[in-house]
């Protein structure tokens, strides 16, 4: 089972919060101490809360549902894309478009447009249009891929979202909360944890901290889906065996 270790969190700098003057008082329960004007996060609580979060993520993934990864800040975008793809999950790593969740039907239209252009490339349509038309379509595709590429295979709303930096991704938080979609998040000392269902208190600016926690979430999903597949394979084998037994008895 995926698990975060205190030593690894310490090495990644996950305990370093923000300047004390920039803190959110609601993060007080997760703060260990103040040192040189910086809040230090209580990593024992991080480990405990991360365990709860990873178990919950695994439970969702084991049902075959999707968890949307969100992280558009410079330090997070490459990690979010890599780990979400590794786990076979959708992601937003460039820009959160208002309505991505609350107006998903409209977003789906843009995704269908992207898929349509990609089919045109494959089926030979590009060979039958002018160079100018082809260039316009390619520019449109590049724009759509940049913003929607990570969710191009998402056909319905996610069962949950996992995000880095609650403050930066406040629109995503607001949309998920309004729809009752569970929110998992790395929450730093300058962020408001009020609307987050599963708070993972940690440094959301350090690349190593982001990578460690995000990869653990991906691991939890991969482990859970592997167990699900094993269970399905075992069930299929049992059904086949029972059918063979009935045939033999007949």
Swiss-Prot record:
CDD domains: RPS2. GO terms for molecular function: structural constituent of ribosome. Pfam families: Ribosomal_S2 (PF00318). One of its GO terms (biological process) is translation. Keywords: Ribonucleoprotein, Ribosomal protein. One of its GO terms (cellular component) is cytosolic small ribosomal subunit. InterPro entries: Ribosomal_uS2, Ribosomal_uS2_bac/mit/plastid, Ribosomal_uS2_CS, Ribosomal_uS2_flav_dom_sf. SUPFAM superfamilies: Ribosomal protein S2. Gene3D superfamilies: Glucose-6-phosphate isomerase like protein, domain 1, Helix hairpin bin. The keyword Ribonucleoprotein applies. The keyword Ribonucleoprotein applies. NCBIfam families: rpsB_bact. Belongs to the universal ribosomal protein uS2 family. This is Small ribosomal subunit protein uS2. It comes from Chloroherpeton thalassium (strain ATCC 35110 / GB-78).
């Amino acid at each position: 089972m995926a698990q975060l270790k205190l030593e690894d969190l310490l090495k990644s700098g996950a305990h370093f919060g923000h300047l004390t003057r920039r803190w959110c008082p609601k993060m007080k329960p997760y703060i260990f101490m103040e040192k040189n004007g910086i809040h230090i996060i209580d990593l024992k609580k991080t480990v405990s809360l991360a365990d709860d979060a990873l178990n919950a993520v695994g439970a969702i993934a084991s049902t075959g549902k999707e968890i949307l990864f969100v992280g558009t800040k410079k330090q997070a975008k490459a990690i979010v894309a890599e780990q979400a793809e590794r786990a076979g999950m959708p992601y937003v790593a460039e820009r959160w478009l208002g309505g991505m969740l609350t107006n998903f039907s409209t977003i789906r239209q843009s995704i269908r447009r992207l898929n349509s252009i990609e089919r045109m490339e494959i089926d030979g349509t590009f060979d039958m249009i002018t160079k100018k038309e082809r260039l316009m379509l390619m520019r449109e595709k590049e724009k759509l891929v940049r913003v929607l590429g990570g969710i191009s295979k998402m056909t319905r709303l996610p069962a949950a979202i996992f995000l880095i930096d609650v403050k930066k991704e406040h629109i995503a938080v607001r949309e998920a909360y309004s729809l009752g979609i569970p929110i998992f998040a790395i929450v730093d000392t300058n962020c408001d944890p009020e609307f987050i269902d599963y708070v993972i208190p940690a440094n959301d600016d350090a690349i190593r901290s982001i990578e460690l926690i995000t990869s653990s979430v991906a691991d939890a999903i991969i482990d859970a889906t592997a167990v699900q597949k094993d269970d399905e394979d075992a069930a299929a084998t049992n059904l086949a065996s029972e059918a063979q037994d009935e045939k033999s008895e007949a």
